[in-house]
Every structure is written in C-alpha cells, then in structure tokens.
Amino acid sequence: MKRLSIILSIGMLMAAQFGLSGAAFPSAATSGTMSGMASVQGTAADYKAVADKAAFRKELASKTSALTTIQAKFVQTKYLSVFSREMKSEGRFYWQKTDKICLDYRTPVAYEIVINGDKIKTVNAGKASFIDTKGNPMMDQMSTLITSCMTGDLTKLGTDFTVNVEESSADYRLTIVPKSKTVRAYIDKMVILLNRKDLSVNRLTMYENASDYTMYDFTDKKFNAAIPQTVFNMR
C-alpha cells in the first residue's frame, strides 16, 4: 500500500499535494468551489463529437511522434471537497523521449517528481524517495497513463482505457477512462484539452472522484529543445 500510495500521491503527477493518507506539504490556498467545474472542462454545449476520429488520432500520432522534448511552465490547481477550496502550485514541466518526465514544483514550496523509465523519484524537503514500477501491472498502467496524458500521445494506451474525442472552436477535448476497476477506485477519468493548432496539451485534469480533481495548465511551451540530463537524474 505504501508503494501504491506514493504513485497515487504523486498525483498521477498531478496530486502531489496530497497522498492517500491525506498527508500534505504546504500549498497556496484560494477559495474555490465545484461551481467552477464547467470552466475546468468546458460545458457540454461547447463540444461536439469529432467527425473523423481515426483521422484525428492519425494526425495526433504524427504530431507527437515528431516530438523529442517538451518544456513548459505549469500551474497546478487541486480541489478537495473536504476542504472546499482550491490549492495552487507552480513549477516547470520537462519531458524527453522516451519515458522521461520531471515536474519541478517551485512555489509555494520546492518539490520534485521524476519518472525515468520504470523508476520514479520524489524529492521533498531535500529527501529523495524511490519506487520501481517494473513487474507491477497497476503501477505500469499508471505510468503509461501519466506519460500519455502529459504529452498527448495516445498510442501507448492500448485497450486498457476508453478514449472519447470531442472538439470546440477553441480546442479538442479528450476524455480518458480506465477500464480497470482497481485503477478507477483512485482515478475516475482524465480530461485533456489540446491546442487546435499544434495539438499540444493546454490543460490536463485528473478526476479522483465526482468532486475532487487536480488540474494542470501549461504555458510557455517549448518543443524539441535540449534538456540537461541532470533534470532526470535518479540519484
């Protein structure tokens, strides 16, 4: 359970503020309620089904296959109904092909999450913790879902998830639902908003249940620029 708690509290790289135990590190809190849910994922009237889903997925696969690195600023907004408020954090996001991810939280406190292959590292208050997802099917699914959602690359999802694709005048909306009941006990669904022009991820929201969510907004994105390998250091 400790290993599962770590990867889930990693927040699917989104819920880093609170683990299954409810333990937390400081986060800037703002007032917020579920009345803002429509702004999180858009209203139903804003979106319609993509006419040619196969063509869309082909274009998306083409775009993501051309990527070697992604760098961006992010703002994480976490809502927990038990507190009836939003908690915000900011930092830098890094991704490198293949399967290297770093979330470098900078405010309100320093915190780091690194995924490098089947290894995961978290650094909190200068103390590093490590877990290995190899040989654990559920944790492997979690890691795959993280990478796919953060980069917009759906090719690795396979048959373990259902994917619904919709569009509006502003963006594409992908709703990803795990088929595994075990996974859904912790992650109800993922909603991704993609930029219509370059199909990059503008927003990623994880719904832990009907009322709690963690949302990432990405800005100042850079593609295929060199990233120092120290960013993904597992030591």
Predicted regions, residues:
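Bacterial N-terminal signal peptides that target proteins for export
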Residues: 1-8
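Bacterial N-terminal signal peptides
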Residues: 9-19
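N-terminal leader/targeting segments and the immediate start of mature chains
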Residues: 22-85, 230-235
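Short, solvent-exposed helix-to-loop capping segments enriched in aromatics
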Residues: 64, 141-156
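N-terminal mature ectodomain segment of secretory-pathway/periplasmic proteins
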Residues: 64-122
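Acidic/charged, solvent-exposed loop-and-adjacent secondary-structure segments enriched in E/D, K/R, S/T
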Residues: 122-148
